[in-house]
């Protein structure tokens, strides 16, 4: 397994932009191995100094995220990674969790992450579900998405506030009246 990670470090370190190769390899490895092997591989990959290999590991975590310990690790540890690319993959991994669980059934976890002290954790939700109203459940219940996102409009983190603005702008393309109503309720200073 260590040799495999070393080969990934060599291969992935040449990738400067994007995440498709890491995502594709993680999915292939997830599908072709049992969960225990994939889990060990993910944790070993996440220890890599090569951020692209950590990205690969986080994609694996997303596929394995129905396991509570994996979801907790994503929330509490991956969210502390200092590489912004790894944070982007955390958002994708969280969306993978929600997709696997079912968006409506994932609401308690979504709400928990939105209240987390770490801004990277909160942002993983807003970015992970960026096109919220294209997702099952939220497509039929757009106000559920809008209310949750709008609750972060005054977040202490500019990083999160910018994400909130971007997500609301995306939602306004499908539901302009709902966003207009929401924005009309804001007290702007």
Identify the role of each PLM range.
Residues 1-189:
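Alpha-helical scaffold domains
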């Amino acid at each position: 397994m260590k040799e495999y990670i070393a080969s990934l470090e060599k291969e992935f370190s040449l990738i400067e932009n994007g995440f498709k190769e890491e995502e594709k390899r993680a999915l292939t490895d997830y599908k072709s191995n049992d969960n225990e092997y994939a889990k060990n591989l993910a944790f070993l990959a996440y220890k890599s100094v090569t951020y692209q290999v950590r990205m690969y590991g986080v994609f694996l975590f997303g596929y394995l995220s129905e396991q509570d310990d994996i979801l907790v690790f994503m929330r509490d540890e991956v969210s502390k990674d200092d590489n912004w690319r790894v944070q982007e993959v955390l958002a994708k991994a969280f969306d993978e969790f929600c997709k696997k669980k079912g968006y409506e059934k994932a609401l308690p976890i979504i709400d928990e992450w939105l209240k987390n002290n770490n801004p990277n954790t909160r942002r993983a939700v807003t970015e992970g579900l960026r096109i919220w109203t294209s997702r099952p459940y939220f497509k039929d219940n757009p106000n559920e998405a809008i209310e949750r996102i709008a609750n972060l409009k005054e977040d202490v983190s500019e990083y999160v506030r910018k994400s909130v603005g971007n997500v609301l702008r995306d939602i306004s393309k499908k539901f302009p009246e709902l966003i207009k109503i929401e924005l009309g309720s804001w007290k702007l200073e």
